[in-house]
C-alpha cells in the first residue's frame, strides 16, 4: 500500500481540490479547510490529482490503531483517568456533544469526497489507450462504491437508531456531491435505515462485480477483460499495470464481500432487524460467499489465534496478507502498544485491564463454562485447567510476560513492584489482570535497550467472518442447518483450534447443538473471547440489545496462612441509559440543520 499512500501525500492541492465545492455553514462536515483551489479541469488531465480525491477517503478509514472502546464494556477498564471511553461510562457522561464513538463528520466527509470523485471519474484522462483508460475507470468506480459502502456501515453502526416515534432511521443518504448552491435543509434529512442498507448493499455488490477478488499480477501473456460494457484483449504488462499486486491494500472484491457480511449481520441483529429489511439468511449468504473464497471450514488458520505475534512479519511485502488476515494496514517497526499496555515491572503503563467478567467467560479446558459443575472449576485455583486462550490473551497472577519472561505478580499484597492491584493509580492494574493479546512478547522495553518489533493492524480478520457466518447461520437455519457447512461446523473448528474438549470430543458443544438458543449463547461467547480487545464488543452488545450496565469486576489476591485467597471486587459501574443501544447524531449538526432528527433519548 506504500504506492497508494504516497499518492495521497501530493499535498494540500489534492485535498483542497475535493473541497473547492465551497464551504459555508457546513465547514465542519467537510474538513480540512481549503488551502488551495484548482479547477476540476486540472484534475481531468492529471490522474494523480484525481486519485488524490479518492485517496482522501482512504485516509479516513480507521488509521491502524485499536480504539480499545472495550473499556466502555464489561470486558475491560483503563487505569488512565483521562481515557474518553472510561469517562463515557459515567452517569450522563455520554452525550450528543461528547461522543467518543462519533463517526458522523469523518464518514460524511469521506462520502463527500467519494461522491465528488464519482461525479467526475468519467471525465478524467486516465490514459491515452482506450483499454487502459476503461480498466482504470472501472477499477476506480468499484473502489469508490466499495468505500462508500464501508463508510455507510460505520455511520449506521454509530448513528442509526429509533426516533421518538419508534421509526428506525439511518443517515442522510447522499449520492451526489454538495456545493455552495446545495439546499442543505433538504439534503440533511435522515433516510430510513432500510434505504441506507439498500444503498450500501448496491454499492458493495457493484464493487464485487467490477473489482478483482484480489490485486495480483498475472503470468498470462494476454488476457480478455470486460470494462464499461466492452471487452478488451490486453497484455500481461497492461493488466498488471492496472490490476496487479502494486495495488494490494486498495479496496478489492474480497473486501467488498467482507463488508457485505459485516453490515448485513449488523442489520439483521435485534437492535435493527425490525426496520432494516435485512434477514439473517441474507447475512449468512454474504458471509459464506467470502468464506468460500477462503476454502470454507478448511480455511480457518491454525495459527490465527496469535496472528499479531508472527515472527516472520518483518518479511511481509505490501502485497501479502497472512492466512488469518483479509485486509490490513502497513507494517511498521515500533513498541507503541507494548509501551502502553505491558505491566509496569517490564516498563509498560498497563493501560488496559481485563475484567473478571471477561476472565470468567473463558471456559474450562474441557469446554464447559466454569458455571457448569462438569467444568470442575476450582475457585481456590481459578486459572488451572482453563481454556488455553486465557493464557494467550490475558496476563493473570503468576504468568510470565515480555522478552525476559518476567513473572507478573498482580496480588494486592505485592510489595515488590507496581504490578500489584492498585499499587499505582496511573500504571497498575485495577482488576488484577493485564492485557496480553495484540502485544509482542519479544520486545524489551528497558530504556537501555528500547526494543522494537513489527506490527500491523488487521482491518478485517477471517475469524470475525467465520463467527459472523456462525451467528447468522444459527439464526437462519439452526445449529446444523445451512448449505455446505453450518454454525456448528464453524464453532467446532474454532474450538478445536483453541484446544478445547477432552479425548478428542467437545461434549458441551454437542449439548449446544441441540438448541438454537444454547448455540446462540455459545457463539456469542466464542465471539467475545476470539475478538476481545479488538473493538467488537462495544458494538456487539448494542446490536444484540444485551445488558450494557453490567458492573466491571476484578480479583484481589492475597497470601493467607491456608494459601492464596481470591476475593472478587467491584471496579467500575456502567451507567448507560436505556437508549444507549443507539448512538446520537452530533448535537451541533442537530442545531445547524433543523431537518435532522435526533435519536430518541439524546
PLM regions: where:
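Bacterial N-terminal signal peptides that target proteins for export
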Residues: 2-13
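An aromatic- and glycine-enriched ligand-binding surface/loop that stacks and positions planar moieties
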Residues: 27-88, 106, 141, 160-173, ...
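Long, intrinsically disordered, low-complexity segments
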Residues: 2, 107-110, 194, 199-201, ...
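C-terminal motif of bacterial Sec signal peptides marking the signal peptidase cleavage site
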Residues: 22-25
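C-terminal substrate/ligand-recognition segments
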Residues: 383, 388-494
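Surface-exposed intrinsically disordered loops and tails
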Residues: 215-245, 300-314, 416-418, 504-510
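Conserved, well-structured interaction surfaces
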Residues: 46-52, 59, 84-161, 181-198, ...
